[in-house]
């Protein structure tokens, strides 16, 4: 018997609304986002506060590179808004019903971006590439439905390309090129 797979893309022209997220943090685990941070091995136990451009004023991160990228987003005058989407709320599936949660959705004065930050030694993994391809498809369909008529683009950025002081545009420009195939 031959197996077939179908892709279904439903374009909703409504806003994507995110619910509140819950994250367990250690006692005294709230840190102002732009202050020096040294406990990088335990970053998942902290909540970073004081964001102005983020959908949420407080954010949690899986890596220090994600935290550094959030600072770049906050400091760049071309960035209008950004969000670190809460787990399993975007509705983006990549394999057999598994959800893909990109690290960031970013709106700048010129475009919109889905951004994934990965360790440089993980950036070529099959799973990472497969998720990136689904992100590229999502961006293509989101561009068709975007009420602002801004193009959505996917960016896969290696952690060693994230440096404070660089602009968002420069950092996005370091992204690995992925084909949609």
Over which residues does each language-model region extend?
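Active-site lining segments that contact anionic ligands and/or coordinate catalytic metals
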Residues: 101
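Phosphate/adenylate-binding glycine loop and adjacent helical scaffold
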Residues: 104
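Intrinsically disordered, low-complexity, repeat-rich regions
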Residues: 1-98, 107-113, 118-181
